[in-house]
Amino acid sequence: MDVSRIRFFRLMTGDFAHGISIPEKVAEIFSGQITKGFNLKSPSGETWRVGVAKVADELILKSGWEDFAKAHELQENDLLFFTCNGHGNGSCSFDVLIFDASGCEKVSCFFTGKKNSYMCKNFNSIGGQVAGQYLSSDSEDTSTPSVLIGSPHKASTSKKLSGKTKTNPRKEPEDPNCSHWHVIEEKNTDDDEHADYHYTRFANYLTGEERDEIFSLVSLQPGNPVFVVVLQTAHVRRRNILIVPTRFAADHLERKSHDILLIRPNRKQKWSVKYYYLSNTTRGFNCHRWIKFIRENRLREGNVCIFELMKGARRPTMTVHVIGKADNRFVLLG
């Protein structure tokens, strides 16, 4: 049998938190070939090394499995689906999908992060043109996930600057699960007409001139809170997420998961998407309804999306203004 075609699932029952067995037929295929363990790629994109042990006649995922189970908050009756994506040198790699007891993919599994890793990415302009390079450090502990490059949830917030300002340093985690903190210089002003405007990390690289050009293209109601996103690959691909800036969510959204209605200017169609509130640092859109919004509005990497929370609406509603670039100029997309 072609090893690369192997797929199997395991239902989390019994003492699953400390180890799970590999199906007998799968274990027979790998007999004598797996000496270094399995590499498990989780929905977050991270890869975990998990050792194998033979107990009686069973092949058990053991060393490192407990860490994997804790990080992904595995519970009784969760279902894990394993798909082989390569093998060799005494190990085998699997993509792992994780479903809860209701049959839905577990959203929390998109947010696992590694504490001993960091990344740095420099941009020279809007549209994802990379000016620098990635920097990463990784622990030698193979039972923990590898460094995650390009994580969609490493985001920070900032406010647009104008008028007379003062600087207030505040601390914010670079990663929802990271023990390392950094200081963000945040500008505050009483006479700033954009005081309620927040920017995700990549949107924060927009220059003042670019921001002025972008906001000149849209009509925003005074007093409505706003956050700005520059779409990355992670936002528009299936099974990925869009993180809502932490400060915006804390100030303007309920501290629980709920539906939010998305509308586009001058269009009758409406989209109800799920807003997930998972912890004090992780909030965002992720589900098939968000993917439907992306697809039906033909959103692309590099688009600038301005999310305007409509005050006074009967239910949580955001108007989404989309800006693209043509001939090196920003244009409003219908």
Curated annotation (Swiss-Prot):
Main location: nucleus
Biased composition (Low complexity): 154-166
Sequence segments annotated as region (Disordered): 142-178
A Pfam cross-reference name: B3
GO CC terms of this entry: nucleus
Presence of the UniProt keyword DNA-binding in the record: yes
Subcellular location: Nucleus
InterPro entries linked to this entry: B3_DNA-bd (IPR003340), DNA-bd_pseudobarrel_sf (IPR015300), REM16-like (IPR044837)
Superkingdom of origin: Eukaryota
GO molecular function: DNA binding
PANTHER family to which the protein is assigned, alphabetical: B3 DOMAIN-CONTAINING PROTEIN OS03G0622200, B3 DOMAIN-CONTAINING PROTEIN OS11G0197600-RELATED
Name this polypeptide is given: B3 domain-containing protein LOC_Os12g40090
Native organism: Oryza sativa subsp. japonica (Rice)
